[in-house]
C-alpha cells in the first residue's frame, strides 16, 4: 500500500472522469460517494456494513466532533479511525459550514469565528489554524481548508467579500497544515453562482496549491439548474490532475449530473437521513414506505437490488416496522439507500471506463421516468 | 430434521436439566433464553445477528401483532417467520398478559376479554379460540394457551378465581388448537405465590395434557425471593419429560436461580430494553454506560467478551454514541447484552452436562461480587 496521497485518472468520457485516489489507508475509486458519519457513526449503520455497500471513504464533521466528544479526547483514544472502527480513509470538513448552519451567536472576524454550541451553549472558536489542529487530532486523511459560507440570500458583493476571506483562510490553512505525508489538504472554491468569482477563487487556490479541490457554496438552496449552471464551467477552472470534490451533493440525479460535468467526489446525508424518515431511493425513483399502498405488498423495494433490505424483506414489512417506529426500519432503509448510492457510483465508474456514460445516463433517466412499480 | 415436536433431556445436575427440543424448524438447546421480538423485530437487531448471538428461538407477542400489522395480514404475507426473516422456531404468547398490562378498558367474562388498543383505541376481542386462531395465522411453532393474569396486588381468593378461569381457558385452548403436527401447545400454570393453588393448577394442566408447561404469574413484582420460593416447588408439580418455561424472566441472577430450580426456557425484554437505555450486562454485573467515568476509557465493556461491541469499540465510544443519542448505541449495547445472555445459557448447559453446575454458579456469583473494573 502506498505511503503517499496520489490521484490517477484512468479514463474520461466527455468531461466525466474515473480514477483512483491512493492513500496509506486504502484506495478511493472515483467518482466516489462518501457517506456522512457526522458524530463518529453513519447513523443506524455498523461501519463494516457501510463498507459492504461499497463505500471507500467516510466523511466526519469537525464541528460535531469538536463539541462532543472533542478532538483532544478522540486523539487520546487513538484517533477517529480507531474510535469509530473504520480503518479506511476519512475526510473531515473544516467546521465552517456547520458553524454557519447550526451554531448560535456567531461572531466573525478576519482571524476566525467564535460561536456557541447548539448542544449546550458553550463558547468555542474556529480559525484556519484551529481547524487544521482539530483535523490533525482526529487523524483524518483528507483535511478541508477552513472557509466561510455566506448565509443565503446574499448580494454578489457579500459573496465576493466572503470568497476573498475564504481564500485568505485557505492560505493560512495551507501554512498551518504543514508537511504531513500520506495526508491531503483540499482547498475550497467559493463564489456563489457568479462565474467571475468562481474563476477568481480557483485561481487563488491554484496559486496556493492543494492535493485536491472542492467546489463549495453549492447545494445550499440554489436549485439544480443553477448548480448545474456553475458546474458547466467551475470544474474546468481546477487542475486536471487533482480530485474535484462537490460538497454536500446530493440526490441521485444531482450526482449523475455532477459526474457528467467532471466531479470526482461527493458527500451527502441524504441516503442515511432519508432512511430514517421512510424514504427509499431506487432505480425507479423515490419510494415513500409510509404510504398505505405498501401495507400488503409482499414485493421487495427493488427486486433487482441485492441489499439485505431487498433480499430478505417485503415492502409490507418495511412499512410495518416504520409505522411501529422500530429501529430496524432505519437500519434497513439506510442500508438500502447507501447500497443504491454505491451501486450508482459503480455504474458511473464502469460506464465512464467503457466510454458509454451517455447510454448509462439515458438508462438512468428512463428508469426513473417509469416511476415506482404499480401497486398490486 | 424432525417433522414432530419433541423434548429430550440429556443430563441433570441436582434439579437443573439440560436437553434439546426438536422442531421442524430446528433444535432449541435447553436451558434456553428467548429474545423478545415483540412486533416482528428484536429491537435494534437484524435477525441474523440475533442468531449469531446463539439464540435458537425468538418470542413474538400476539397482542402487538394482532393490533399491527394484524395476524390476517401476516398470514397473507406468508407467516411471521417469513415476514420477519427468522426461519428458526418462534414461540408466541397468548396475548393475555399484554391485554392486562397494556390495553385500555378491559372487560372480562367467562367467554374472553374485550379491550381497546393502546395504539389507536380500536376495539378488540380475545378468547382461547381467537388466541389459538391468531397464533396459527402467525405460524408460531410453540403456541401458548390463553390465560388471565390478575392485576397485583390481589387477594388469594382473587388469584384462585383467576387461576381456575385460566384452567377452563386452558382446556378450551387445547380443544381449539386441534391437531397440528410439528407445533406445540404449552399450558400455563398460575396460582400466584400460593403452593396449594400452584399444585391445583398443575394438576388441571396435566389432566388436559400439553407438549410443554409454563410457569406464569411470576416476575410481576413479587421480588426474587418470593419467585425463588415458588420455583423451589412449582417445577416439581410438572411432568419431568416436558419442557418447563418460566415466562418473563429475567435478570442474569434470576435466570441462574431458575435454571438451578429446574426451569428449561425463559424470555425477557431486559437485555434488549437495557441496551436502549444504556445498561450493559457483563460477567461482573451491570454497567451504566451513561456514567461519566467511561468518557475517556479506552477499554471494552468486557475484555473477555467476543461480541462486536466489545471486540471493536471502547467504553468511551459507547458512552459518546449513547450521549449523542446515536442509533448505533442501541445496536451495539443490545447486541452485547443478547450475546452475554446466550453465553450465560451456554455456560449453564455445559456445566449441567458436566455435572459441575455448583462450581459454575459459584464462579458466576463471585465474578459479580467483584463488580465492574476499576475506573482508570
UniProtKB/Swiss-Prot annotation, chains A, B:
Q: Which reaction does it catalyse?
A: 7-aminomethyl-7-carbaguanine + guanosine(34) in tRNA = 7-aminomethyl-7-carbaguanosine(34) in tRNA + guanine
- Tell me the residue numbers annotated for binding Zn(2+): 305, 307, 310, 336
Highest taxon, organism lineage? Bacteria
Annotated metabolic or biological route of this protein = tRNA modification; tRNA-queuosine biosynthesis
| UniProt xrefs under Gene3D superfamilies | Queuine tRNA-ribosyltransferase-like
Q: Write out the GO MF terms.
A: metal ion binding; tRNA-guanosine(34) queuine transglycosylase activity
Task: Detail the disulphide connectivity of this chain as listed in its UniProt entry.
Answer: none
Q: Which EC number(s) does the record attach to this protein?
A: 2.4.2.29
Q: Which cofactor does it need?
A: Zn(2+)
Please name the Pfam families in this protein's record. TGT (PF01702)
Q: Which InterPro entries match?
A: ArchSynthase1/Queuine_TRR, TGT, TGT-like_sf, tRNA_ribo_trans-like
Which catalytic residues are annotated?
93 (proton acceptor), 267 (nucleophile)
Subunit structure, interactors included:
Homodimer. Within each dimer, one monomer is responsible for RNA recognition and catalysis, while the other monomer binds to the replacement base PreQ1.
- What this chain does, per the record? Catalyzes the base-exchange of a guanine (G) residue with the queuine precursor 7-aminomethyl-7-deazaguanine (PreQ1) at position 34 (anticodon wobble position) in tRNAs with GU(N) anticodons (tRNA-Asp, -Asn, -His and -Tyr). Catalysis occurs through a double-displacement mechanism. The nucleophile active site attacks the C1' of nucleotide 34 to detach the guanine base from the RNA, forming a covalent enzyme-RNA intermediate. The proton acceptor active site deprotonates the incoming PreQ1, allowing a nucleophilic attack on the C1' of the ribose to form the product.
Q: What is this protein called?
A: Queuine tRNA-ribosyltransferase
Name the source organism: Cereibacter sphaeroides (strain ATCC 17029 / ATH 2.4.9) (Rhodobacter sphaeroides)
Amino acid at each position: 500500500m502506498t505511503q503517499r496521497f496520489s490521484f490517477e485518472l484512468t479514463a474520461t468520457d466527455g468531461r466525466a472522469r474515473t480514477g483512483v485516489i491512493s492513500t496509506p489507508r486504502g484506495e478511493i475509486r472515483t467518482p466516489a460517494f462518501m457517506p456522512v458519519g457526522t458524530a463518529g457513526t453513519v447513523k443506524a449503520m455498523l461501519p463494516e456494513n457501510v463498507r459492504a455497500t461499497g463505500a471507500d471513504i467516510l466523511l466526519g464533521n469537525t464541528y460535531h466532533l469538536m463539541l462532543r466528544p472533542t478532538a483532544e479526547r478522540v486523539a487520546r483514544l487513538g484517533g477517529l479511525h480507531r474510535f469509530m472502527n473504520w480503518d479506511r480513509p476519512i475526510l473531515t470538513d473544516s467546521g465552517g459550514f456547520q458553524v454557519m448552519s447550526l451554531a448560535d451567536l456567531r461572531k466573525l472576524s478576519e482571524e476566525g469565528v467564535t460561536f456557541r454550541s447548539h448542544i449546550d451553549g458553550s463558547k468555542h472558536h474556529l480559525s484556519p489554524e484551529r481547524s487544521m489542529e482539530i483535523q490533525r487530532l482526529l487523524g483524518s486523511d483528507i483535511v478541508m481548508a477552513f472557509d466561510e459560507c455566506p448565509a443565503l440570500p446574499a448580494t454578489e458583493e457579500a459573496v465576493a467579500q466572503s470568497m476573498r476571506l475564504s481564500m485568505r483562510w485557505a492560505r493560512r490553512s495551507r501554512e498551518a497544515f504543514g508537511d504531513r505525508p500520506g495526508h491531503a489538504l483540499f482547498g475550497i472554491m467559493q463564489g456563489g453562482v457568479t462565474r467571475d468569482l468562481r474563476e477568481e477563487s480557483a485561481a487563488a487556490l491554484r496559486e496556493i496549491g492543494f492535493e485536491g479541490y472542492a467546489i463549495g457554496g453549492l447545494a445550499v438552496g440554489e436549485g439544480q439548474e443553477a448548480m448545474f449552471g456553475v458546474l458547466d464551467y467551475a470544474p474546468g477552472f481546477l487542475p486536471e490532475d487533482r480530485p474535484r470534490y462537490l460538497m454536500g451533493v446530493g440526490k441521485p440525479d444531482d450526482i449523475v449530473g455532477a459526474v457528467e460535468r467532471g466531479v470526482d467526489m461527493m458527500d451527502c446525508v441524504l441516503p442515511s437521513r432519508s432512511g430514517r424518515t421512510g424514504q427509499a431511493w431506487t432505480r425507479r425513483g423515490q419510494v415513500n414506505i409510509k404510504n398505505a399502498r405498501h401495507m400488503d405488498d409482499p414485493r421487495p423495494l427493488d427486486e433487482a437490488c441485492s441489499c439485505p433490505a431487498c433480499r430478505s424483506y417485503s415492502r409490507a414489512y418495511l412499512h410495518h416496522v416504520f409505522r411501529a417506529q422500530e429501529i430496524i426500519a432505519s437500519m434497513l432503509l439506510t442500508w438500502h439507500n447507501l447500497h443504491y448510492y454505491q451501486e450508482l457510483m459503480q455504474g458511473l465508474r464502469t460506464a465512464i471506463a467503457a466510454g458509454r456514460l451517455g447510454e448509462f445516463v439515458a438508462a438512468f433517466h428512463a428508469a426513473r421516468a417509469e416511476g415506482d412499480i404499480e401497486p398490486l
